[in-house]
Amino acid sequence: MAACGEPGRPWQEEEAAAVVVVGSCMTDLVSLTSRLPKTGETIHGHEFFIGFGGKGANQCVQAARLGAKAAIVCKVGNDSFGNDYIENLKQNHISTEFTYQTRDAATGTASIIVNNEGQNIIVIVAGANLFLNSEDLKKAASVISRAKVMICQLEISPAASLEALTMARRSGVKTLFNPAPAMADLDPQFYTLSSIFCCNESEAEILTGHAVSDPTTAGKAAMILLERGCQVVVITLGASGCVILSQAEPVPKHIPTEAVKAVDTTGAGDSFVGALAFYLAYYPNLSLEEMLKRSNFIAAVSVQATGTQSSYPYKKDLPLALF
């Protein structure tokens, strides 16, 4: 595996990316309102903005802002949103060598409504993301095989995510799988191909059929997921932190986080995943528990500002103790 140097050092395109994401790019269309509308109701919002999102790109951007050499394998439309997105990735120092454009679909979009408490409802139209295919992945095999960590989600086709995970595992690359948006009938291979299986409470509910509302119920859901073949299961619980369970230590452990005033929780889970990937790649000797504590902290910073990627902190904005 190619050496990846020090986090945060400017890097050349020929250097191997330590964190590789195979996933989605979405243009966020965000409306801020005092409260969320009811069915059939029209309400006034007080602000609108267009931002950059998509679980894959979000996770990649957070890892890059912490100092990771990062690359993304994704597909956007051959349109203004797609062109703007490629420029956004470059500005975040993310390799776009395998960022493809297609004329067959528009760049993916996410329509987001956020209330005064920072709660949100989201509708995504995946668009070009679903056109990322096996041929695209094969072209990107060199960057996937040389990574230290590869992240996948489910905003691209499940078949593409499964193929990417298979490629990574075959090359000895650590895999971090975020099963979002969750599917009740998830292919069993996703569990066995994931070095770390990381989901939130609502995703854990869909996957297991059991209610998840606190660390205790999260631990029970994690046990079910572990029994399906995962090596490590992490269930995030928002303001309550997260729960971890592993084959090596099959007793659920709750890792709390600091209480903060949330302004906008959109993308907080992606901030957590991106931070975790950064620590897995650059601080492999840290305990997983410590990595999760630090990832909790970074995600908590992100909820204190509006927007998705716009809320993600840079290394320079964070305490030195995290590095």
Curated annotation (Swiss-Prot):
It catalyses: D-ribose + ATP = D-ribose 5-phosphate + ADP + H(+). Keywords: ATP-binding, Carbohydrate metabolism, Cytoplasm, Kinase, Magnesium, Metal-binding, Nucleotide-binding, Nucleus, Potassium, Transferase. It is found in: Cytoplasm; Nucleus. Pathway: Carbohydrate metabolism; D-ribose degradation; D-ribose 5-phosphate from beta-D-ribopyranose: step 2/2. PROSITE patterns: PFKB_KINASES_2. InterPro entries: Carboh/pur_kinase_PfkB_CS (IPR002173), PfkB_dom (IPR011611), Ribo/fructo_kinase (IPR002139), Ribokinase (IPR011877), Ribokinase-like (IPR029056). One of its GO terms (cellular component) is nucleus. It is an enzyme of class 2 (transferase). Requires a divalent cation, most likely magnesium in vivo, as an electrophilic catalyst to aid phosphoryl group transfer. It is the chelate of the metal and the nucleotide that is the actual substrate. Substrate binds at residues 26-28, 54-58, 155, 270. Homodimer. HAMAP family: Ribokinase. This is Ribokinase. It comes from Mus musculus. The lineage of its organism: Eukaryota, Metazoa, Chordata, Craniata, Vertebrata.
